[in-house]
Design a protein with these regions (language model features):
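Conserved beta-sheet core of the metallophosphoesterase superfamily
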Residues: 91, 99-103, 118-123, 129, ...
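Beta-strand-turn-beta hairpins that frame and shape the catalytic cleft
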Residues: 33-43, 144-154, 200, 256-260
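Catalytic metal-binding/acid-base residues of hydrolase active sites
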Residues: 49, 76-77, 106-109, 158-160, ...
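Structural motif
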Residues: 44, 70-73, 200-204, 246
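Active-site-proximal loop/helix segment associated with metal-binding centers of metalloenzymes
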Residues: 15-22, 134, 148-227
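Core catalytic region of metal-dependent phosphoesterases/phosphodiesterases
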Residues: 3-9, 20-29, 35, 41, ...
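Long, low-complexity, intrinsically disordered segments
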Residues: 295-311
């Protein structure tokens, strides 16, 4: 659903609403998010592990533009082999007219000068970039980026729960997969300088108390899993004043309060102006619903419909 389609559908919904059908707040919000979004849209998804077909299809469907940003919340799968196989994946993404903004995961090497990366600037923060692939960027942990008026701090890395499985098969394992003490100190220093207030946290794993234990693999002995990063993030979360926190890593999709765990789903980082407009529209919608309810027009409301693939 693009902006024009969203506008047409919302107009049709408003016309139908004059005759009684009631649309949910979530359904209206999905359309407003598309209509009110700025041109420099920021999309986001979870781990891709080198499988970019769904991302490329999504970008084609959305008719993305070079000034748009696509955030991958770690384990993009672009720095795994450090050979032609990685270059093939990068060549694939280089054809997509959008800037990919990747967090560091646990199943990949950290970008460095040794891998041919250079430090560049993007949306107010430092990133790693290879000159041959200027639209593929890797965030630097502890940096704060401005996406549509939102201050966003990045915290990559996690522990590989499949560590021993990978070692037994001779698969790659990266010793610096988790944030170092130096990185942790930087993150805490940056947040302290901001009086522990940030709009959005983008991380690969998340605070310990939000672990989706219901999807844990039964063959993994959790007592062998190093959860020091999650414990540290929980300590960060306890004293942080934030609006939203997005992370991936667990290959599941879940929302708990201000926390959202992402996998194959998509969302957008909204513009602060669009958020204000959305809230105003929703306030008016609530008022209209109250009036309709008082008149007894909501008693026979139809079943609610499904929204778009962005939420």
């Amino acid at each position: 659903m693009d902006r024009e389609e969203a506008a047409k559908e919302l107009m049709a919904m408003l016309e139908e609403a004059q005759e009684g059908p009631y649309y949910s707040e979530e359904e209206v919000r999905a359309h407003l998010l598309e209509i009110l979004a700025p041109r420099n849209q920021v999309y986001m998804t979870g781990d891709t592990h080198g499988q970019f077909e769904r991302v490329i299809e999504f970008c084609a469907r959305r008719e993305v533009e070079p000034e748009n940003t696509f955030v991958i919340l770690g384990d993009a799968g672009l720095n795994y082999y450090n050979d032609r196989r990685d270059r093939k994946k990068k060549d694939q993404l280089a054809q997509v007219p959008i800037t990919f903004f990747c967090l560091h995961g646990n199943h990949e090497m950290r970008p460095s000068e040794e891998l041919g990366y250079e430090v560049a600037e993007y949306h107010g923060g430092k990133v790693w970039m290879q000159p041959a692939y200027p639209n593929i960027l890797f965030a630097i942990d502890g940096e704060v980026y401005d996406f549509n008026g939102n201050s966003c701090i990045v915290i990559g890395g996690a522990y590989s729960v499949d560590k021993y499985y990978r070692l037994a098969r001779g698969w790659s394992l990266f010793p610096d997969e988790q944030p170092s003490e130096e990185i942790k100190a930087k993150v805490e220093r940056v947040l302290a300088e901001r009086n522990w207030k940030i709009d959005i946290v983008l991380s690969h794993t998340g605070p310990l108390k939000y672990e989706p234990t219901e999807v844990f693999l039964p063959m993994i002995d959790q007592s062998t899993v190093d959860k020091s990063t999650e414990v540290w993030l929980e300590q960060i979360e306890a004293k942080l004043d934030y609006e939203r926190w997005y992370f991936a890593h667990y290959h599941t999709e879940k929302e708990v309060g201000k926390i959202r765990i992402m996998h194959n789903d998509y969302t957008m980082i909204p513009h602060e102006a669009s958020v204000a407009a959305e809230k105003d529209m929703l306030r008016r919608m609530h008022r209209q619903a109250e009036i309709m309810e008082a008149l007894g027009l909501l008693d026979d409301a139809p079943n609610q419909k499904n929204g778009d693939d962005i939420s």
